[in-house]
Design a protein with these regions (language model features):
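Glycine-rich N-terminal segment of FAD-binding domains in flavoprotein oxidoreductases
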Residues: 71-103
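Gly/Ser/Thr-rich loops at beta-strand to alpha-helix junctions
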Residues: 82-92, 186-191, 266-267
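A glycine-rich beta-strand to alpha-helix segment
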Residues: 173-202
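Class I SAM-dependent methyltransferase SAM-binding "motif I" and its flanking Rossmann-like core
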Residues: 193-241
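ATP/nucleoside-binding phosphotransfer catalytic cores, i.e., glycine-rich phosphate-binding loops
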Residues: 2-23, 36, 41-47, 52-54, ...
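Conserved acidic residues
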Residues: 80, 177-183, 256, 299
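A glycine- and small-aliphatic-rich helix-loop capping segment at beta-alpha/alpha-beta transitions
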Residues: 95-106, 128-129, 197-206
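Ligand-binding beta-strand-loop-alpha-helix segment within the catalytic cores
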Residues: 29-50, 57, 104-183, 238-239, ...
Length: 316
């Protein structure tokens, strides 16, 4: 007895994205060890899975990878465009630490925050509001860098006015030799930024889906709301906005490199990200699972080792 055998007539019927084959997804839940981590035919030869033993290891290693991208671009004399998330967050402290230790400034870096909470029209909170992603980035990354920080004119946030300019700005940078790196986490419904799986049903083809660069006032999936209630709002569901501004695959699939993170452990054996990680790694790329496309790009996905263990039920 499980969801598959009891779905009919339940409150969950019609809840999941229409393009999800729950039977296939259920089989992915069985994967563990080498069966999970072995490269799939569609993986980019430059894609690498990096297990991290502890959360401290995860934050340090991902922070080092971000700092190393910035340092290498500086040494190469290249501009660096970085699409940045708010979450995971612990890596920014270490990125700052490494850059300061190396004496590397960020004058060549262009930061593009990938998303922001909004209403249905794409209006966002003021940038200095404690709940705004802009505020979070200023506190975690741009501020602590001090005099070596990213220039104000090169910090871009996903507001109604600024997000539609991302594609042209990034395109102009790349045309002059800049490198584009996307830093990301994986959502409960396998979104990248707030690009939700159900959006796939709105496009006539995968090609048109892959070309869309952004969305203002994107309607979020209920599982996204609840994920953020648990991970960012301390269970206070009514404080989570139902819409967000977000980049789309037309931007993140243009990345020259990626740095991803999966750290969704909650403690006492509880977690929220194990199945989402398996869908990302082992499901053939499809617009209905946005994160499944990230393995087709070169770069690294840092993962808490516990998420690679078996997903055996355990009552808590």
């Amino acid at each position: 007895m499980d969801l598959l055998t009891t779905l009919s007539g339940s409150a969950m019927e019609g809840f999941f994205p229409a393009g999800w084959n729950l039977g296939v997804i259920d089989k992915l839940g069985d994967l563990r060890g080498e069966g999970l981590t072995k490269p799939r035919p569609w993986w980019n030869p430059g894609f690498q899975l990096v297990p991290c033993g502890t959360l401290a290891d995860f934050d340090t290693m991902l922070g080092h990878a971000i700092a190393l991208e910035i340092r290498q671009a500086k040494e190469q004399g290249r501009q660096l465009a970085m699409i940045l998330p708010v979450g995971p967050m612990g890596m920014y402290r270490w990125a700052v630490w490494f850059l300061k230790q190396w004496g590397v400034d960020c004058l060549h870096v262009h930061g593009f925050n990938m998303d922001e909470w909004s209403d249905a029209q794409g209006n966002t909170l003021p940038g200095d509001h404690p709940g705004a992603f802009q505020h979070a980035m200023e506190q975690a990354f741009y501020g602590p860098l001090g005099a070596a920080t990213v220039p104000l004119s090169q910090r871009h946030f996903a507001t109604r006015e600024k997000l539609p300019t991302y594609a042209d700005r990034i395109g102009a940078l790349k045309s002059k030799g800049a490198r584009l790196v996307t830093v990301f986490g994986i959502g409960r419904v396998c979104h990248i930024a707030f690009w939700e799986p159900q959006f796939a049903g709105e496009y006539p083809s995968a090609r048109e889906w892959a070309a869309d660069t952004h969305r203002l006032g994107a309607k979020l999936h209920p599982l996204t709301i609840e994920q953020n209630a648990l991970t960012s709002f301390k269970s206070w569901t009514t404080r989570v906005p139902a819409f967000a501004n977000t980049i789309g695959p037309g931007l993140f699939l243009q990345s020259d490199g990626i740095l991803g993170g999966a750290d969704g452990m909650l403690g006492r054996g509880m977690q929220w990200q194990g199945l989402s990680l398996r869908m990302t790694l082992a499901h053939e790329p499809t617009p209905w699972i946005p994160s499944s496309h990230m393995t087709t790009l070169p770069g690294k996905l840092f993962v808490l080792s516990e998420l690679l263990d078996g997903l055996d039920p355990e009552c808590n």
